């Protein structure tokens, strides 16, 4: 099954997450099919904390991909704030 989920990057105690489309059996930070955005929980000032390519996310959902619970919550909050970009 294909999943849309977060892959952790960044340094120790400074997380940075890539939003990726991957096979269910791959490791959290392992091989992925496509990168569809990022999430920076420590963004301050004018730094972008969330960028989503909603066109590609909707494409994968329509083709049977399932989102993680955390990603679902991020997208829901982004829609409320109108922060996401549909272009990428």
Swiss-Prot record:
Pfam families: Ribosomal_S16. Coiled coil: none annotated. Keywords: Ribonucleoprotein, Ribosomal protein. The keyword Nucleotidyltransferase does not apply. GO terms for biological process: translation. One of its GO terms (cellular component) is small ribosomal subunit. One of its GO terms (molecular function) is structural constituent of ribosome. HAMAP family: Ribosomal_bS16. Belongs to the bacterial ribosomal protein bS16 family. This is Small ribosomal subunit protein bS16. The lineage of its organism: Bacteria, Pseudomonadati, Pseudomonadota, Gammaproteobacteria, Candidatus Palibaumannia.
């Amino acid at each position: 099954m294909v999943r849309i989920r977060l892959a952790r990057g960044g340094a120790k105690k400074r997380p940075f997450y890539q939003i990726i489309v991957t096979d269910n059996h791959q490791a959290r930070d392992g091989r992925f099919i496509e990168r569809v955005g990022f999430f920076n929980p420590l963004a301050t000032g004018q730094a972008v904390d969330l960028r989503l390519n909603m066109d590609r996310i909707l494409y994968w959902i329509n083709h049977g991909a399932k989102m993680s619970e955390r990603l679902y919550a991020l997208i829901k909050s982004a829609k409320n704030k109108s922060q996401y970009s549909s272009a990428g």
